[in-house]
């Protein structure tokens, strides 16, 4: 069975139906746009037919949104399907993953029989990525996965740094995960999606379910040069994106009011949560850039696994980060939720750490 991710609370045997407040999964606390519910009901009978195998309308609309033609877009059953598709189609001998990060990068390389080089970023440098030419000394490295902003640390790599790497290593395919970029202030300083059409070794992958609040529907997309798209489409499963997910994504992307409201809320609320966590003795939160906060525990009395269990006893779930490569039981991650829910979390944490 799949392990090592947040968001399993609804299906947990021990805590089912106990009203757990889930801070373990980083999903928009506003949920989905109201129009998504409406459009799904209106189009529910679409399940009587096969979905559009090419996601034609959705690819065209996504292309318009990100400034790319539709033949440079692939839509998948969540971004994770696309992470597995990329190495399966391009067949790298070796791939680099900068750790700690999303575990499915390494799993995708493993499933394609590529050798994995885990470059663990330094704790004393706050796990920040800095470009080093030595990363690419091994000439068998043909693929690099980089999460921006990184999950779970929240670290951002500037656009110029990424593009410099891509240009200097034209024989390496760089896969940039921008799943949380919609939560970032001034995303144009970090996103490289506009450059995918002119750079034959750059792929940008994005999720449509985290920001728009419907992870149960599973939908994401990638943007890449048309030559790469042709190669990847040879290996992509047909009909992987259902009809309701396609119409939900179209509707969500059109909801400018929801997008604006969600971003403004997140910019304010994550700062509130960061400041409150900073006041708790024994915690050192990292400055958040997306919809989650990465926290270091500075006391030996409450490792992350124990903290997780104690919080579950109070009806709250967090993401224990001890199973991330490069981390230990001094780290956890929490999603940014509503003010009322965040207050409950902070109050419970203070109670637990002062006992």
Residue positions per predicted region:
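PLP-dependent enzyme catalytic core of the Aspartate aminotransferase-like
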Residues: 160, 313-314, 325-355
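Short loop-beta-helix segment that forms the pyridoxal 5′-phosphate
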Residues: 51, 63-85
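Conserved PLP-binding catalytic core of the aspartate aminotransferase-like
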Residues: 266-267, 280-314
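N-terminal "arm"/small-domain region of PLP-dependent enzymes with the aminotransferase-like
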Residues: 1-49, 130, 139-140
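Active-site phosphate-binding strand-loop segment of PLP-dependent enzymes
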Residues: 123-184
């Amino acid at each position: 069975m799949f392990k090592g991710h947040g968001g399993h609370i609804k299906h947990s045997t021990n805590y089912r139906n106990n009203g757990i407040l889930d801070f373990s999964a980083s999903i928009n606390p506003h949920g989905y746009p109201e129009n998504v519910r409406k459009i799904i009901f209106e189009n529910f009978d679409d399940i009587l037919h096969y979905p559009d195998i090419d996601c034609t309308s959705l690819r065209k609309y996504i292309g318009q949104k990100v400034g790319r033609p539709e033949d440079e877009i692939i839509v998948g059953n969540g971004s994770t399907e696309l992470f597995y598709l990329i190495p399966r189609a391009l067949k790298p001998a070796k791939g680099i993953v900068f750790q700690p990060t999303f575990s499915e990068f390494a799993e995708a390389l493993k499933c394609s029989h590529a050798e994995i080089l885990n470059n663990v970023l330094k704790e004393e440098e706050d796990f920040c990525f800095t470009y080093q030419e030595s990363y690419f000394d091994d000439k068998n490295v043909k693929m690099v996965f980089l999460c921006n902003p990184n999950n779970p640390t929240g670290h951002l790599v500037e656009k110029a740094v990424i593009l410099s790497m891509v240009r200097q290593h034209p024989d390496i395919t760089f896969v940039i995960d921008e799943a949380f970029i919609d939560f970032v202030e001034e995303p144009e300083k970090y996103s490289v999606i506009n450059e995918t059409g002119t750079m034959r070794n750059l792929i940008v992958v994005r999720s449509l379910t985290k920001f728009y609040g419907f992870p149960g529907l599973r939908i994401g997309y990638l943007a890449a040069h048309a030559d790469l798209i042709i190669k990847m489409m040879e290996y992509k499963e047909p009909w992987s994106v259902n009809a309701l997910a396609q119409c939900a994504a179209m509707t969500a992307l059109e909801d400018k009011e929801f997008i604006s409201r969600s971003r403004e809320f997140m910019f304010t609320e994550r700062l509130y949560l960061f400041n409150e966590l900073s006041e708790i003795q024994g915690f050192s939160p990292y400055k958040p850039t997306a919809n989650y906060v990465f926290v270091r525990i500075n006391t030996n009395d409450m490792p992350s696994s124990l903290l997780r269990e104690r919080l579950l006893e109070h009806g709250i779930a967090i993401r224990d980060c001890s199973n991330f490569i490069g981390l230990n039981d001094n780290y956890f991650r929490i999603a940014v939720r509503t003010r009322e829910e965040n207050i409950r979390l902070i109050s419970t944490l203070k109670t637990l750490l002062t006992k």
